[in-house]
A protein has these predicted regions:
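Structural signature of alpha-helical solenoid repeat scaffolds
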Residues: 51, 86, 118-122, 163, ...
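Glycine/serine-rich loop-strand microenvironments at binding/catalytic pocket rims
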Residues: 1-21, 76, 80-102
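N-terminal alpha-helical scaffold/docking segments in eukaryotic complex subunits
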Residues: 1-56
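Amphipathic alpha-helical scaffolding segments comprising HEAT/armadillo-like alpha-solenoid repeats
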Residues: 23-36, 56-71, 90-103, 123-146, ...
Length: 220
């Protein structure tokens, strides 16, 4: 099906795209090699359609395609690739996500990477992730959160992601974000309070249900 992907006039069909599911190692390698040769708009279409197919049928595993797309030169493709891996819990995804969070030039991609790393924070709390792996995730999210040169959207999403952790510094970070003058950080702090499942935040959340800002009320 690679030849059809590389041929812009060729129509993308569901049957054809399904051939990209559960690729063997050699097939995945061939895809990674051919991927940059596919025109940008076509790559955007492919990744978006694969996301839709995977949502409709959870048995379809397009991880190999999404992994290849994480390296795409197009930011929209990279962001969609991260979204497409929303159910993937393999530890081999941690390093690529951290790289995107720390080095990607586009805030949209960094936001998606931060949110995706939150999955591994939850796995750690469920004792389903080794400590060494969690430490990598924790350090990456903390760097993003504490980077005052980073945009608030990314910092806020990093806080939301780490919010499920019971590390002492996380509670302090949530409180600091809640008290900050940055609206995005306050909203993310409320989201993180919910993810923490910590009863100490309940009075704050109840109080914010009466906030004039609909986004604040929604998160509360």
């Amino acid at each position: 099906y690679l030849s059809e992907l590389m041929d812009p006039p060729a129509r993308l069909s569901v049957a054809g795209l399904q051939q990209l599911a559960s690729l063997e190692r050699e097939q995945a390698a061939a895809l990674r090699s051919a991927w940059p040769q596919i025109e940008a708009e076509r790559r955007r279409q492919v990744v978006h359609l694969l996301m839709e197919l995977a949502e409709d049928n959870v048995d379809l595993d397009f991880a190999a395609v999404f992994f290849a797309a994480l390296e795409d030169e197009d930011a929209a493709v990279r962001a969609d690739a991260v979204r497409g891996l929303w159910e993937y819990e393999g530890r081999d995804l941690i390093a690529p996500l951290l790289r995107l969070l720390e080095k990607d030039e586009e805030p949209e991609v960094r936001v998606e990477a931060a949110l995706a790393l939150g999955r591994f924070v939850v796995l750690s709390e469920l004792v389903s992730l080794r400590e060494e792996h969690f430490q990598q995730v924790e350090e990456g999210l903390r760097r993003a959160l504490e980077d005052e040169l980073e945009v608030d959207e990314v910092r806020g999403r990093a806080l939301e992601a780490i919010g499920a952790s019971d590390r002492p510094w996380v509670e302090q970070a949530i409180q600091a974000a809640y008290e900050s003058e940055a609206p995005r950080l306050k909203v993310s702090a409320l989201h993180a309070m919910g993810r923490s499942c910590d009863g100490r935040w309940l009075p704050v959340l109840i109080e914010e249900l009466a906030n004039d800002d609909p986004e604040v009320r929604y998160e509360a």
